[in-house]
From Swiss-Prot:
Mg(2+) 2 binds at D14, D139. It comes from Anaplasma marginale (strain St. Maries). The lineage of its organism: Bacteria, Pseudomonadati, Pseudomonadota, Alphaproteobacteria, Rickettsiales. Its cofactor is Mg(2+). This is Ribonuclease H. The gene is rnhA. InterPro entries: RNase_H, RNaseH-like_sf, RNaseH_domain, RNaseH_sf, RNaseHI.
Length: 154
């Protein structure tokens, strides 16, 4: 779905972690409707894979200069199901899961939801390591950030 006046962008995201928790990285490829592309990445020295998956989408959406018609492609069912299904119930339950435990990564879920309200978003799950060029590139960016954080200083 494309809303009138909104630029189209396809976003491919991935997160990675060595150990869980451990050094982690995220990567995103943004493909704009006019043919332009942008790659962004980052990471943290002590994080989890799920935090990196969420951060990848957050940073990609935050990189957009205005409201867009977005297709987010993620290999994380945690991210896709969390934002499209679970978050409504979590909020109604005071950020508790169906088994009454505290929702993890609430800070990131709140920020992701805030950013989703700025755009028209279609969420797609893509199979990891299945040959999708842009998902593979996002994975490479994320893994590069992990490796950068694993280098032992001399």
């Amino acid at each position: 779905m494309v809303l009138m006046g909104k630029s189209r962008v396809a976003i491919y995201t991935d997160g990675a972690c060595s150990g869980n928790p451990g050094p982690g990285g995220w990567g995103a490829v943004l493909r704009f409707g006019d043919g332009g592309e942008r790659r962004i990445s980052g990471g943290s020295d002590d994080t989890t894979n799920n935090r990196m998956e969420l951060t990848a989408v957050i940073m990609a959406l935050a990189a957009l200069s205005g409201p867009c018609s977005v297709c987010v492609n993620t290999d994380s069912t945690y991210v896709k199901n969390g934002i499209t299904e679970w978050i409504r119930k979590w909020k109604l339950n005071g950020w508790r899961t169906s088994n009454k435990s505290a929702v993890k990564n609430v800070d990131l879920w709140v920020e992701l939801e805030r950013l989703t309200l700025l755009h028209s978003i279609e969420w797609r799950w893509v199979k990891a390591h299945a040959g999708n060029e842009y998902n593979e590139e996002a994975d490479m960016l994320a893994r590069g950030e992990v490796e950068r954080r694993m280098v032992i200083p001399k």
